[in-house]
Regions:
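Interfacial helix-start motif at the membrane-water boundary
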Residues: 41-61
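Membrane-proximal helix-loop-helix units in multi-pass membrane proteins
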Residues: 71-136
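Membrane-interface interhelical loops and short amphipathic "cap" helices
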Residues: 2, 29-45, 111-124, 150-152
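Alpha-helical transmembrane segments and their helix-start/interface "positive-inside/aromatic belt" motifs
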Residues: 1-16, 46, 87-94, 125, ...
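Membrane-water interface of transmembrane alpha-helices
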Residues: 57-74, 139-143
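Alpha-helical transmembrane segments of multi-pass membrane proteins
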Residues: 15-31
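Terminal transmembrane helical module of multi-pass membrane proteins
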Residues: 134-162
């Protein structure tokens, strides 16, 4: 199957909606939404929440730049910084979105599962899911860095967004 820019756009929109719905569902299902902060003092949330919005803006900057602003051929030429371009950049980009967005859809539910059960393995589930999302974010940065190395217009925005 050939991965196209339009396919990635559609994937990101559908999965992005599912991520947002998982947040709405998770928060609405929680008896105590403050417990989702995991013991972080509520006084800290005034510092954390703005960074959540900055992260969301960065995601949108990257998304807009790579999927709408640059030429479609740029996507095919995306590579890892240590490799050469082989025309499979769309595959790398889709993999990156998958590794970032699918765990983003699952972390809140896994956190609630952990809070509601006494199993010894649930912390590893939550940490594993969040680690995958973090790896996806690093992958975004690596693709942006290689685009920057290749002189792609908008790569600086992608780096800033990642």
């Amino acid at each position: 199957m050939e991965i196209t820019r339009q396919f990635i756009r559609t994937f990101v929109i559908i999965v992005g909606i599912l991520v947002l719905l998982s947040y709405v569902y998770g928060v609405s299902k929680s008896d105590d939404a403050t417990a989702l902060w995991g013991g972080i003092p509520l006084s800290w949330t005034k510092f954390i929440v703005p960074w959540m919005f900055i992260a969301a803006i960065g995601f949108l900057m990257y998304w807009w730049t790579i999927l709408y602003s640059v030429d479609a051929s740029v996507i095919d030429n995306l590579r890892w910084p240590w490799g050469e371009s082989d025309g499979k950049g769309a595959n790398r980009l889709l993999l990156t979105y998958c590794v970032f967005m699918i765990p983003s859809m699952l972390w809140l539910e896994s956190t609630q599962f952990h809070m509601n059960n006494e199993y010894s393995w649930t912390p590893f589930l939550v940490i594993g899911i969040l680690t995958l999302a973090s790896i996806g974010n690093i992958m975004f940065g690596l693709l942006a860095y290689s685009a920057y190395q290749d002189g792609v217009e908008g790569a600086g925005t992608m780096l800033l967004g990642s």
